[in-house]
């Protein structure tokens, strides 16, 4: 069996990626989230496939087909809620995964980091289009508001929006194409994940100390397979608890009303995982400025390697940077809270302050503090 595992053309790839992969001996549980994201993606593809068997991408029957799935299909309700809450778990793991990359300086592995950013944009696009499919009030108005943002692009904006809509408003054509894209994108995500892992295995994983670990490697199996399995059990526990006890905790009640183009909901807001970006978008009074801020709030991750002025890769020995990192995390929590609040005083000013702080921390304050720490360490 050992010879087959190491010599068979297909099994050799699996073996070098999952079994005999040399891994640093000191990576902590923060490194579990890569495998958890793989588990989330698998869950989403499987549940999504079963949902697609019963879903109809038509404005007149989409909402009814979701009701049919929940009421008439065998265990349809659990498949639907696993898919909806699985997306929340996906983004939770995604944010922690990115946060770990920032804290421990994994962004210095440039190819892996950049593919990760492309993956983030693709997953966000997939989740947005998935949110439109139930064709409830928030689905319809969310699609209208977010696609309308493209009209801020000078000269081609209006034509671009109508081209995406397939008409003069969000309608049947929009729903059909969103379903088509929502179905195909997870497979593109899978391909990108393979590229992400390919680049990661070119350099090897980073570790909490941020120092080369070539002199002290251990095989991935059994050490990290067992460790990842524990993380997986905890994720399953959290997801199943959410699905069975409070499946609608993270959804919007407005989405249980069929889409009505003549009636606007009082507060249009996306799912919780987009609220931080939505708060940044709303904090700028100018439409084009808001769209650019929204886009750069995520694209800013791409320039973080250029802003890394510290001599040490990891933050583990840099207390000032750690302090700023946790301020950034707290700031993101504030932005998430503000994104779900109505546009009125004092939420507006809090959102604007948090947005300015978000960009200031990443672009100005953290690089300067890195330089100060270099001086303190006489580097």
Curated annotation (Swiss-Prot):
GO cellular component: mitochondrial inner membrane; respiratory chain complex III
Cofactor binding: number and manner: Binds 2 heme b groups non-covalently.
Binding site for heme b b562: 83, 182
Species for this entry: Varecia rubra (Red ruffed lemur)
Gene label: MT-CYB
Cofactor(s) needed for function: heme b
Membrane topology per record: Multi-pass membrane protein
Name this protein carries in UniProt: Cytochrome b
Coiled-coil portions: none
Biological role stated in the UniProt entry: Component of the ubiquinol-cytochrome c reductase complex (complex III or cytochrome b-c1 complex) that is part of the mitochondrial respiratory chain. The b-c1 complex mediates electron transfer from ubiquinol to cytochrome c. Contributes to the generation of a proton gradient across the mitochondrial membrane that is then used for ATP synthesis.
One GO-annotated biological process of the protein: mitochondrial electron transport, ubiquinol to cytochrome c
């Amino acid at each position: 069996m050992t010879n087959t595992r190491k010599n068979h053309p297909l099994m050799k790839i699996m073996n070098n990626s999952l079994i005999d992969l040399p891994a640093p001996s000191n990576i902590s549980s923060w490194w579990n989230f890569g495998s958890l994201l793989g588990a989330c993606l698998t869950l989403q593809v499987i549940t999504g496939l079963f949902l697609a068997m019963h879903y109809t991408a038509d404005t007149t029957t989409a909402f009814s087909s979701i009701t049919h799935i929940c009421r008439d299909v065998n265990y349809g309700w659990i498949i639907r809620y696993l898919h909806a809450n699985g997306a929340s778990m996906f983004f939770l793991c995604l944010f922690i995964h990115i946060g770990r990359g920032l804290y421990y300086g994994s962004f210095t592995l440039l190819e892996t980091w950049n593919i990760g950013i492309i993956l983030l944009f693709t997953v966000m696009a997939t989740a947005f289009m998935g949110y439109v499919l139930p064709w409830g009030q928030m689905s319809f108005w969310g699609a209208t508001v977010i696609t309308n943002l493209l009209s801020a692009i000078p000269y081609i904006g209006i034509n671009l929006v109508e081209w995406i809509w397939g008409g003069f408003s969000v309608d049947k054509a929009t729903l059909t194409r969103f379903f088509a894209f929502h179905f195909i994108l997870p497979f593109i995500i899978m391909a990108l994940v393979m590229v992400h892992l390919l680049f990661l295995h070119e350099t090897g994983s980073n570790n909490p100390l941020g120092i080369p670990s070539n002199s002290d490697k251990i095989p991935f199996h059994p050490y990290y397979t067992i460790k990842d399995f524990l993380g997986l059990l905890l994720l399953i526990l959290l997801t199943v608890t959410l699905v069975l006890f409070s499946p609608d905790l993270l959804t919007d009640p407005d989405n249980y009303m069929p889409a009505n183009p003549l009636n606007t909901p009082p507060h249009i807001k996306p799912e919780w995982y987009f609220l931080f970006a939505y708060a940044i978008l709303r904090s700028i009074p100018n439409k084009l400025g808001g769209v650019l801020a929204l886009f750069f709030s995520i694209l800013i991750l791409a320039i973080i390697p250029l802003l890394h002025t510290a001599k040490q890769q990891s933050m583990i020995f840099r207390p000032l940077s750690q302090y700023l990192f946790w301020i950034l995390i707290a700031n993101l929590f504030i932005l998430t809270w503000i994104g779900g609040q109505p546009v009125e005083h004092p939420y507006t000013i809090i959102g604007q302050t948090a947005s300015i702080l978000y960009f200031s921390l990443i672009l100005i304050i953290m690089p300067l503090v890195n330089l100060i720490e270099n001086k303190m360490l006489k580097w």
